[in-house]
């Protein structure tokens, strides 16, 4: 086999492989482009902004289909205050809209980033699971004051990825018409 034939063959293989590489890069780009952005406002919780940002970061590094960031037109707001028995909680539709209330007393007692990440989990569509271990972010305060895990576990990540796969839309409602 001549060097010329070998070179021509190598160029031919490269030309055939390049569209595959470009195609897979394009798929990654479109997947990333499909991520829904939830705009948040931390202006109502200035004392805890750094912990809120860190909690958002835990979600952003864990999931691809939704990303949270501070931007104009916020649909998710964080406020701080004393909320008594309710403590920190979220009033949300689970679709990235609502208000997260950060309680002073709980922030003094529990891991601050865990609280903000946990409450953000509600805004993304997850429910509480207080009986869960510390490794479950949505076990919340049920895991005790010694728990410092602020990252969603594999099951929580998969749930969010599934729910936000095409942007999170309202759940389907079925009715039988007669």
In which residue ranges do the predicted regions lie?
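The catalytic-center signature of Zn2+-dependent metalloproteases
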Residues: 110, 123-169
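Surface-exposed patches in mature extracellular/periplasmic domains of secreted proteins
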Residues: 63-73, 127-133, 171-175
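Catalytic zinc-binding patch centered on the HExxH motif and its immediate surroundings
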Residues: 29, 77-101
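Secretory targeting and sorting signals
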Residues: 1-27
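Acidic/histidine-rich, surface-exposed loop or edge segments in extracytoplasmic proteins
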Residues: 32-44, 95-102, 140-141
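A short alpha-helix/helix-coil micro-patch that ends at or immediately precedes a cysteine
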Residues: 39-68
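Active-site recognition of the HExxH zinc-binding catalytic motif
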Residues: 59, 114-128
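Short pre-active-site segment immediately N-terminal to the catalytic Zn-binding motif
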Residues: 100-117
């Amino acid at each position: 086999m001549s060097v010329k034939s070998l070179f021509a063959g190598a160029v031919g293989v490269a030309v055939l492989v390049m569209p595959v590489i470009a195609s897979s890069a394009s798929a990654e780009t479109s997947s990333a482009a499909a991520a829904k952005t939830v705009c948040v406002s931390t202006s109502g919780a200035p004392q805890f902004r750094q912990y809120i940002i860190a909690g958002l970061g835990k979600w952003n590094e864990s999931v691809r289909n939704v990303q949270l960031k501070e931007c104009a037109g916020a649909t998710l707001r964080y406020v701080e205050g004393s909320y008594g028995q309710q403590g920190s909680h979220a009033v949300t539709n689970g679709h990235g809209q609502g208000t997260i209330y950060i309680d002073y007393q709980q922030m003094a007692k529990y891991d601050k980033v865990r609280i903000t990440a946990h409450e953000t989990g509600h805004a993304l569509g997850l429910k509480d699971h207080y009986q869960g271990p510390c490794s479950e972010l949505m076990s919340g305060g049920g895991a005790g004051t010694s728990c410092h895990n602020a990252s969603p576990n594999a099951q929580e990540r998969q749930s969010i990825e599934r729910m936000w796969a095409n942007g999170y839309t309202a759940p389907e409602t079925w009715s039988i018409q007669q």
